[in-house]
Amino acid sequence: MTAATKLQSEDLRCAVVAEGLSLHNVSRREFCAAGGTLLAGDKVVSGRFSGDRLISVRTEKLGDVDLEADNYILATGKYFSGGLAADMDRLYEPLFGLDVEYDEDRSKWFDASFSAPQKFLEFGVKVQDGRALKDGVKIVNLYPAGEILAGISSAQCDARESVINSAMEAAAAIGRK
C-alpha cells in the first residue's frame, strides 16, 4: 500500500502534488480504486495560501479551476523534475516559494571530484514537525515527502527507502489529525 492509497482508504481528503518519478511507481489502479483522482499528464502550477494553510492548487490543464483538499503532500522531487531550481545566487522551490535549506556559498554546493559526495544533492525544503515552511511559517496542511526534503539524496544507498518512509510518515501525520 502506498501513502496515497492509505490516505484514500481512510477517507482522508488529500491532494498529492507529484512531479517526480514517485507517481510512476504507484499502482494507478489501486490509487483510483481507493477513491483517488489521478490527473495524468497535468501539472500543478500554483497554490493559494491563507495564513498558515494551503487552500487550493491550480493545474496547467484545468486553468482557473481551484482544486481543494484538507491536506497536501508535495512530492515533486529535486532538480531534474523541477522540484528545486537554482539561479546564480540562490536555490529555491519554484511552485509554492517554500523555504529551502542550502549553503548560500555556491562554491560549496559541489565537490570537484565526481565520485565524492555532492552537497547540492542534500539540499531541499525545510520542514518543522513534518510540515513545509514558507517565509518561516509552518504550513499546517502541506507535507513534503521524498527527494524534495532536505537531507534526502538519490545518491544515498538507502534513498528509495528514505523516500518511501517520508511519504508514509506524511500519510501517518495526516491520519493523526
Give residue ranges: language-model regions:
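Residues forming the flavin
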Residues: 1-177
